[in-house]
């Protein structure tokens, strides 16, 4: 387990594949700038538009480059239980430290089916599992009562909670906060979730402000709560601008503006609207990230 900031890393693409040279640079940059853990092939990494072979290669490559300096978390969950198991087994084989398993989307399963999905994956592997709750994308919510039940599975050790509902997070902490680590899945709720006993954040903002996102968490853990809150508020407008369109469109655009060679988005994601690009650029300039 880790405490602090886990970057939900973008995947740098070429026109027809993954830019591994740039991926290596990004991994090293994050380690240098005190990112506490690295998630690959997640939502921000455009995992849904990567082929199975691309995902396997990115996971393997990232594990090898990072070489245990920080934990590497592999986004292996899909709405297909069998496919999720296959990729999770592969991540375990190549040395990933944890897998991130999203709630199954589109299928519209029941709570019984949701539990069966996670239970089947849990029983098939021997690697820690971080659940991913993001109802706005999946149409499926992990309720506090369901999390309390899932926390009894031996490999389920954490949840990325992106419902945006702090009352729900509080109930989760009350029911099973002693058995499962809760990470904020929203950059505007890092400090509120830390105040409920959270362990950190899985962050989009960390793609462009790795050390600063780490510091929000670190200062809180050191008891410097006001300083942590002030950093949260300092970067709030910038964080919000990264969601002015569907993630990861703005953050990948921002990184290219910052002279990272992250390449194109993959369809059906496309370039930002001009009016939103102006807002993003203004926020990047205000924080000294571009001129």
Curated annotation (Swiss-Prot):
PANTHER family: 4-HYDROXY-2-OXOGLUTARATE ALDOLASE, MITOCHONDRIAL (PTHR12128:SF66), DIHYDRODIPICOLINATE SYNTHASE (PTHR12128). InterPro entries: Aldolase_TIM (IPR013785), DapA (IPR005263), DapA-like (IPR002220), Schiff_base-form_aldolases_AS (IPR020625), Schiff_base-form_aldolases_CS (IPR020624). Pathway: Amino-acid biosynthesis; L-lysine biosynthesis via DAP pathway; (S)-tetrahydrodipicolinate from L-aspartate: step 3/4. Belongs to the DapA family. The record marks 43, 106 as: Part of a proton relay during catalysis. CDD domains: DHDPS (cd00950). The keyword Cell membrane does not apply. Its EC number is 4.3.3.7. It is found in: Cytoplasm. HAMAP family: DapA (MF_00418). Catalyzes the condensation of (S)-aspartate-beta-semialdehyde [(S)-ASA] and pyruvate to 4-hydroxy-tetrahydrodipicolinate (HTPA). It comes from Clostridium perfringens (strain SM101 / Type A). Keywords: Amino-acid biosynthesis, Cytoplasm, Diaminopimelate biosynthesis, Lyase, Lysine biosynthesis, Schiff base. Pyruvate binds at residues 44, 202. The keyword Amino-acid biosynthesis applies. GO terms for cellular component: cytosol. This is 4-hydroxy-tetrahydrodipicolinate synthase. GO terms for molecular function: 4-hydroxy-tetrahydrodipicolinate synthase activity. GO terms for biological process: diaminopimelate biosynthetic process; lysine biosynthetic process via diaminopimelate. The active site is at 132 (proton donor/acceptor), 160 (schiff-base intermediate with substrate).
């Amino acid at each position: 387990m880790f405490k602090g900031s886990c970057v939900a890393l973008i995947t740098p693409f070429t026109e027809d594949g993954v830019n591994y040279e740039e991926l290596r640079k990004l991994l090293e940059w994050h380690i240098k700038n005190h990112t506490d853990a690295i998630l690959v092939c997640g939502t921000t990494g455009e995992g849904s538009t990567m082929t199975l072979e691309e995902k396997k290669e990115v996971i393997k490559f990232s594990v090898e480059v990072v070489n245990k300096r920080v934990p590497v978390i592999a986004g292996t969950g899909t709405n297909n239980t069998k496919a999720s198991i296959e990729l999770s087994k592969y991540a375990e084989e190549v040395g990933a430290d944890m897998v991130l398993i999203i709630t199954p989307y589109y299928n519209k399963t029941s709570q019984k089916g949701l539990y069966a999905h996670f239970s089947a994956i849990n029983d098939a592997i021997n690697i820690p599992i971080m659940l991913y709750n993001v109802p706005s994308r999946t149409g499926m919510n992990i309720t506090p009562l369901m999390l309390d039940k899932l926390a009894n599975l031996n490999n389920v050790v954490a949840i990325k909670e992106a419902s945006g509902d702090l009352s729900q997070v509080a109930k989760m902490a009350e029911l099973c906060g002693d058995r499962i680590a809760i990470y904020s899945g929203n950059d505007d709720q890092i400090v509120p979730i830390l105040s409920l006993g959270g362990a950190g954040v899985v962050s989009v903002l960390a793609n462009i402000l790795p050390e600063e996102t780490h510091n929000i968490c670190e200062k809180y853990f050191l008891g410097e709560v006001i300083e942590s809150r002030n950093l949260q508020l300092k970067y709030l407008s910038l964080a919000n601008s990264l969601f002015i369109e569907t993630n990861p469109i703005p953050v990948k655009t921002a990184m290219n503006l910052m002279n990272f060679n992250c390449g194109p988005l993959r369809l059906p994601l496309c370039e930002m609207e001009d009016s939103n690009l102006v807002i993003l650029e203004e926020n990047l300039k205000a924080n000294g990230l571009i001129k």
